[in-house]
Amino acid sequence: MMPYNTPPNIQEPMNFASSNPFGIIPDALSFQNFKYDRLQQQQQQQQQQQQNRTASSLQQPQQQQPISPPLFLVGAGTSENSNLNKNANTSTIPPLLFSRSSQHYVVPDIDHSSIIYKNNICKSFKDDLFFCPRSLLSLEEQQACEKMDRLTAEQMSLYHQNTQSSSNPGSMSSSPPNSASSIFNSRPKFNPYTSQSFNPLESVQE
């Protein structure tokens, strides 16, 4: 029978030459170098993690700061910003700008009086629902519109005479201005619901 191979004692030094059939003795220095390289890699990884944390902590307050809008949209009450608003409106009207602040959007100031002036909107149709061309009106309604045109022309002539008389106090106008204003205020307005041209029953009966 073969004898039982007992394991070597841990406390006793191992004889590598006798146990190793190839006669290779492990190098203790290579094992120490492996440990040293491993420690260096761990230290480098820790340093990189700390640098990344510091960089992220510095970038967070910069990202929280809101982006300031352009000068021509901030403080419309000041004189400089109002001049910038006028220049911006004459050239090109900027779109609605959404900001991160409490105000959801900023609308630039637009002078609507110039648009109304250019369109030359008639005063008699300001309060109506929609504008009806005279070609769709009946003969009686066209005659009424002609009378209204004459009254407005008379009123404008009286207004020009009054302005000239106020500029020249020597020449006084003979016609009273109150009569034209009373006629202008008492004129009837066009009602599409009572007009004969908007009667659908006539087309149905035919």
Swiss-Prot record:
Residues 38-88, 160-206 are annotated as: Disordered. The modification Phosphoserine is found at residue 68. Its main location: cytoplasm. Keywords: Cytoplasm, Phosphoprotein. The keyword Transmembrane helix does not apply. Residues 40-73, 165-186 have a biased composition (Low complexity). It is found in: Cytoplasm. One of its GO terms (cellular component) is cytoplasm. Residues 78-88, 192-206 have a biased composition (Polar residues). Present with 922 molecules/cell in log phase SD medium. This is Uncharacterized protein YPL229W. The lineage of its organism: Eukaryota, Fungi, Dikarya, Ascomycota, Saccharomycotina.
